C-alpha cells in the first residue's frame, strides 16, 4: 500500500525498506537522496531544511547513522527539469540500495528507469501523475509519501481564496509547467471557469530559479492579478521565502500549500 505520511514519519518507511534490503546486502547501506531543486547542502542534518532534518533525524533514531552503517549520496536537479533524465540515469547506474526522490516527475522517471531498486517518493497525487494505478495496490517498486489529498483540493483552495478576497476576478497560479499542464492545473482551470474567474500564468519554466519567479510574478501583476494560488511543488518549497517576499512586495493576497510558508510571513 502507498504510505501517506508526513515529516519524520516517512523515515520509518525508509528504514523498513532498508531493513528488508539488508538481508541481501552488506551492513553498510547506500541511499540516494535526489531533490528536485533543494541545494545539496540542505540534504543533511544541520542543512536547515525542516523536511530533511526530520527525515534524517528519524533515521538516526532508528539506528541508521551516516558514517557508521549508512552512506548517503546526494543529488539535486537544481530546479532544471531538463536535467532530470540525466540525473536519473546517473543514480540508477550506481545501483544504490534505495532511492528517495522528491517531486512527481522525478519519481515517475525513476520508476520508468528501474524495476529493481526500491523507490520512496515524496509526490503530489501519485495516481493522477501516473506513478501508481491505485493507492491500495500500487505494485512495482515504488512506495512513498504524498501531501496531496487529491486534485479536487485545488477547487477548495479557490473557494477559500474567494472568501478571503471576494472581489478577485483574476487569480495567478504559481507552479511549474508539469503541474500547470497536468491534473492540478486542469482542476483549477475548470474551477475558475465555473466561478467566472480568469486564471493567470504563465507557468514557471527551466531553469526554475529566483529570476524565473520574479519574471512570472511580474507578468501576473502586469495582468492585474488580484490574488495568487501557490502550487504545492518541491520547487516552490525550495523558494518559499522568495515567494512570500514577492507576494508581500506586490501586495498580492496568496493562499499557500502548507504552514511552512506562514512561518516565513505568508
Model-derived segments and their meaning:
Residues 1-266:
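Short hydrophobic alpha-helices and adjacent helix-cap/hinge residues
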